[in-house]
From Swiss-Prot:
Gene3D superfamilies tied to this protein: GIY-YIG endonuclease
InterPro entries: GIY-YIG_endonuc, GIY-YIG_endonuc_sf, UPF0213_domain, UPF0213_GIY-YIG_endonuc
Gene label: yhbQ
Family label: Belongs to the UPF0213 family.
SMART domains: GIYc (SM00465)
Stated name of the protein: UPF0213 protein YhbQ
Database matches in PANTHER family: UPF0213 PROTEIN YHBQ
Amino acid sequence: MTPWFLYLIRTADNKLYTGITTDVERRYQQHQSGKGAKALRGKGELTLAFSAPVGDRSLALRAEYRVKQLTKRQKERLVAEGSGFAELISSLQTPEIKSD
């Protein structure tokens, strides 16, 4: 299983873009070259502010959604300290269902 990553990219006007990928460096280069998300095109210099492995695609999609719901201040705390990231991921993981 290919691991998925959550990443945040900072734009020149200090906004944070959140995305997921299996290859952070490749995806960052796509954004830099204008071949990534439309939201980042023409936004000036981009910097990779944060990235972390999150598990499978399903978990990555849930983590991306949850991070996009955070306030700017909470995202900045995540970037600066990784604050709460482990808790966020563990809260998204579904408990295993045991069969008898």
